[in-house]
Amino acid sequence: MGLGPVFLLLAGIFPFAPPGAAAEPHSLRYNLTVLSWDGSVQSGFLTEVHLDGQPFLRCDRQKCRAKPQGQWAEDVLGNKTWDRETRDLTGNGKDLRMTLAHIKDQKEGLHSLQEIRVCEIHEDNSTRSSQHFYYDGELFLSQNLETKEWTMPQSSRAQTLAMNVRNFLKEDAMKTKTHYHAMHADCLQELRRYLKSGVVLRRTVPPMVNVTRSEASEGNITVTCRASGFYPWNITLSWRQDGVSLSHDTQQWGDVLPDGNGTYQTWVATRICQGEEQRFTCYMEHSGNHSTHPVPSGKVLVLQSHWQTFHVSAVAAAAIFVIIIFYVRCCKKKTSAAEGPELVSLQVLDQHPVGTSDHRDATQLGFQPLMSDLGSTGSTEGA
């Protein structure tokens, strides 16, 4: 049975970590997802690859074709890169479908198996590699690809899934050992190749800063400072009164989110007394540069950015979609003609793994709607 169009909410696309004194390591991250429907593993799979935290490759159909995500990647690397990645991603998708087929406790309905692989090269040339498995969005198994050490959460369900998958992977011990050694080496080899090509040069793109104010309410106004179009993602944005930073509890920060073109955006807001606008400024610091931005006086027309417009449209579309689904289900119940959903909503959560220190790169998550034709041809033969 084919799934038809599947709506996915895919999280963890962009990893974030608090800025520290040490330089961030270079990283290559593979995120693969396969699906099953009523115990039948579907033929499609979804893969997203991030290079130094930026979207790099994406493969979302049965006949996968890796495509560069953003002009910054397309300008540097040629067709040979995409051909090689397409071949490797297709093989990895097949392996993950075979793993999903050996999970014994699958029940009716839609289920997902997600594999995340991350390799890093640090400033001192040390390396780290890890692999993590999620079933229906829940982490159940992690492995340090360098030490071959496995870890798993304490829940009984996670341990059952972990033993199931480990037993399958250990059916041929020598093959498994060779496979994971190659996985570790290949990831680092690809990362070094990209570093050598110059595609991940530590470029800097300064932010555009815009300060807006709301209409007065009970003698107060809300002032918002937005920074957009900057890279890298770590930025300082805060409000100051007479040159002194406001306390943390008087400000509200938005998450640092991708703009969709390889850069990032964020905002900070606070409430101030009407008439004291000239005492407040927004302070921005990014990649060694800093600037201050005053609150505009008088009434200001606030124009929506492309991201805001998309966000509002997406929320409205989601609300309409939910209403339609609710109406259809009610009608089906009344007519007793429900034969299973044509549109399925799947939420794959790229969470922090529990019980391992190897996967440290996802502390803030944003959600991005994604439409895909996964599994349009039904189950795979021989996985």
Swiss-Prot record:
Ranges of the Cytoplasmic topological domain: 329-383
GO annotation, cellular component aspect: cell surface; cytoplasm; external side of plasma membrane; extracellular space; plasma membrane
Consequence recorded when altering K148E: In allele MICA*002, allele MICA*004, allele MICA*005, allele MICA*006, allele MICA*007, allele MICA*008, allele MICA*009, allele MICA*010, allele MICA*011, allele MICA*012, allele MICA*013, allele MICA*014, allele MICA*015, allele MICA*016, allele MICA*017, allele MICA*018, allele MICA*019, allele MICA*020, allele MICA*022, allele MICA*023, allele MICA*024, allele MICA*025, allele MICA*026, allele MICA*027, allele MICA*028, allele MICA*029, allele MICA*030, allele MICA*032, allele MICA*033, allele MICA*034, allele MICA*035, allele MICA*036, allele MICA*037, allele MICA*038, allele MICA*039, allele MICA*041, allele MICA*042, allele MICA*043, allele MICA*044, allele MICA*045, allele MICA*046, allele MICA*047, allele MICA*048, allele MICA*049, allele MICA*051, allele MICA*052, allele MICA*053, allele MICA*054, allele MICA*055 and allele MICA*056
UniProt KW keywords: Adaptive immunity, Cell membrane, Cytolysis, Cytoplasm, Disulfide bond, Glycoprotein, Host-virus interaction, Immunity, Immunoglobulin domain, Lipoprotein, Membrane, Palmitate, Signal, Transmembrane, Transmembrane helix, Ubl conjugation
Ranges facing Extracellular side: 24-307
Annotated phenotype, changing V199I: In allele MICA*006
Subcellular location, principal: membrane
Disease: Anti-MICA antibodies and ligand shedding are involved in the progression of monoclonal gammopathy of undetermined significance (MGUS)to multiple myeloma. Psoriasis 1: A common, chronic inflammatory disease of the skin with multifactorial etiology. It is characterized by red, scaly plaques usually found on the scalp, elbows and knees. These lesions are caused by abnormal keratinocyte proliferation and infiltration of inflammatory cells into the dermis and epidermis.
Description of how the protein assembles with itself and partners: Unlike classical MHC class I molecules, does not form a heterodimer with beta-2-microglobulin. Binds as a monomer to a KLRK1/NKG2D homodimer. KLRK1 forms a complex with HCST/DAP10 in which KLRK1 binds MICA while HCST acts as an adapter molecule which enables signal transduction. Interacts with PDIA6 on the surface of tumor cells, leading to disulfide bond reduction which is required for release of MICA from tumor cells.
Functional description taken from the UniProt entry: Widely expressed membrane-bound protein which acts as a ligand to stimulate an activating receptor KLRK1/NKG2D, expressed on the surface of essentially all human natural killer (NK), gammadelta T and CD8 alphabeta T-cells. Up-regulated in stressed conditions, such as viral and bacterial infections or DNA damage response, serves as signal of cellular stress, and engagement of KLRK1/NKG2D by MICA triggers NK-cells resulting in a range of immune effector functions, such as cytotoxicity and cytokine production.
Protein name as it appears in the record: MHC class I polypeptide-related sequence A
Organism of origin: Homo sapiens (Human)
Gene, per the UniProt record: MICA
